[in-house]
From Swiss-Prot:
One GO BP annotation of this record: translation
Keyword terms: Ribonucleoprotein, Ribosomal protein
Keyword set includes rRNA-binding: no
Record protein name field: Large ribosomal subunit protein bL35
Region (Disordered): 1-26
Protein's organism: Actinobacillus succinogenes (strain ATCC 55618 / DSM 22257 / CCUG 43843 / 130Z)
GO cellular component, one term: cytosolic large ribosomal subunit
PROSITE patterns membership: RIBOSOMAL_L35
TM ranges: none
GO molecular function terms noted in the UniProt entry: structural constituent of ribosome
InterPro entries with a match to the protein in the record: Ribosomal_bL35 (IPR001706), Ribosomal_bL35-like (IPR021137), Ribosomal_bL35_CS (IPR018265), Ribosomal_bL35_sf (IPR037229)
Phylogenetic classification of the source organism: Bacteria, Pseudomonadati, Pseudomonadota, Gammaproteobacteria, Pasteurellales
Recorded family membership: Belongs to the bacterial ribosomal protein bL35 family.
Residue ranges with Basic residues bias: 10-26
Pfam families documented for this protein: Ribosomal_L35p
């Protein structure tokens, strides 16, 4: 049985937590930042969790996580 390949882009974007979930970075913080308020940018800096509905997709991309 061959090894399952890890999706490298997903490996760089998601980290598994001890409880089995995945943490991720918020989007919309790379460019076009002048029109966004300081409060909005500050809230986007915090990490977030992957939704339960999307957990299955992330697990498929990261078979050894």
């Amino acid at each position: 049985m061959p090894k399952i390949k890890t999706v490298r882009g997903a490996a760089k974007r998601f980290k598994k937590t001890a409880s089995g979930g995945f943490k991720r970075k918020q989007s919309h913080l790379r460019h076009i930042l002048t029109k966004k308020t300081t409060k909005r940018k500050r809230h986007l800096r915090h990490k977030s969790m992957v939704a339960k509905a999307d957990n299955v997709l992330v697990v498929a991309c990261l078979p050894y996580a």
